[in-house]
Amino acid sequence: MSSQDVLIHSDDPCHPANLICTLCKQFFHNNWCTGTGGGISIKDPNTNYYYLAPSGVQKEKMTPEDLFVMDAQTLEYLRSPKLYKPSACTPLFLACYQKKDAGAIIHTHSQNAVICSLVFGDEFRIANIEQIKAIPSGKVDPVTKKPMALSFFDTLKIPIIENMAHEDELIDDLHKTFKDYPDTCAVIVRRHGIFVWGPTIDKAKIFNEAIDYLMELAIKMYQMGIPPDCAIGEEKKHLKMASP
């Protein structure tokens, strides 16, 4: 086995190379990463290496041999597959690692994200929904010193940026969202999809699933005439549906 292949072969299902393939297959079946769209990157906390899904690979068929591995310090590729080129998302993944101290980033072409980007303006908003409690608030508990989640009564806000012809051209707007929304763990790209990050791949996956649930719910609320961020008790005032 070559020194490059050692980086991607492990019997541990939680090894980044194995996890990326497992999750990409799962996300394909969730209809989030079809037609080679989307991608995942995970930072190995033991080595400080970035593992990155390549461009142009069918996500449900991806294997560890298809992955790129990059040194987090030098940003040099330690391993490059012969059949694929680096993902166009790579500069965006690196920005999340460097500016948000992310441990993993998920990019999907979720239809819920795309629809929400057409319905909302500069930001997606939803409030007073239980699932919001799965999303980090960006604040730290003064007693436990642990990160705090949003509460049921909080409003989740996710910035929406305009799509570009090439994904690496999104970098300036992504940096702007880091400044304007310092507590966000996601950004929606209009008519494109969503990027979600977290301190670990487990957290990023939870955030991504919760946000997609909330976006789907917001779409259904919008179809009923209910503003997704409306106050508790105000829902029936907005209903388009006739009373039974």
From Swiss-Prot:
<feature type="binding site">
    <location>
        <position position="107"/>
    </location>
    <ligand>
        <name>Zn(2+)</name>
    </ligand>
</feature>
<dbReference type="InterPro" id="IPR027514">
    <property type="entry name" value="Salvage_MtnB_euk"/>
</dbReference>
<dbReference type="InterPro" id="IPR036409">
    <property type="entry name" value="Aldolase_II/adducin_N_sf"/>
</dbReference>
<dbReference type="GO" id="GO:0046570">
    <property type="term" value="F:methylthioribulose 1-phosphate dehydratase activity"/>
</dbReference>
<keyword id="KW-0963">Cytoplasm</keyword>
<dbReference type="GO" id="GO:0019509">
    <property type="term" value="P:L-methionine salvage from methylthioadenosine"/>
</dbReference>
<comment type="pathway">
    <text>Amino-acid biosynthesis; L-methionine biosynthesis via salvage pathway; L-methionine from S-methyl-5-thio-alpha-D-ribose 1-phosphate: step 2/6.</text>
</comment>
<feature type="binding site">
    <location>
        <position position="89"/>
    </location>
    <ligand>
        <name>substrate</name>
    </ligand>
</feature>
<keyword id="KW-0479">Metal-binding</keyword>
<comment type="function">
    <text>Catalyzes the dehydration of methylthioribulose-1-phosphate (MTRu-1-P) into 2,3-diketo-5-methylthiopentyl-1-phosphate (DK-MTP-1-P).</text>
</comment>
<dbReference type="InterPro" id="IPR017714">
    <property type="entry name" value="MethylthioRu-1-P_deHdtase_MtnB"/>
</dbReference>
<keyword id="KW-0028">Amino-acid biosynthesis</keyword>
<dbReference type="Pfam" id="PF00596">
    <property type="entry name" value="Aldolase_II"/>
</dbReference>
<feature type="binding site">
    <location>
        <position position="192"/>
    </location>
    <ligand>
        <name>Zn(2+)</name>
    </ligand>
</feature>
<keyword id="KW-0456">Lyase</keyword>
<feature type="active site" description="Proton donor/acceptor">
    <location>
        <position position="130"/>
    </location>
</feature>
<dbReference type="GO" id="GO:0005737">
    <property type="term" value="C:cytoplasm"/>
</dbReference>
<keyword id="KW-0862">Zinc</keyword>
<dbReference type="GO" id="GO:0008270">
    <property type="term" value="F:zinc ion binding"/>
</dbReference>
<feature type="binding site">
    <location>
        <position position="109"/>
    </location>
    <ligand>
        <name>Zn(2+)</name>
    </ligand>
</feature>
<protein>
    <recommendedName>
        <fullName>Methylthioribulose-1-phosphate dehydratase</fullName>
        <ecNumber>4.2.1.109</ecNumber>
    </recommendedName>
</protein>
<dbReference type="InterPro" id="IPR001303">
    <property type="entry name" value="Aldolase_II/adducin_N"/>
</dbReference>
<comment type="similarity">
    <text>Belongs to the aldolase class II family. MtnB subfamily.</text>
</comment>
<keyword id="KW-0486">Methionine biosynthesis</keyword>
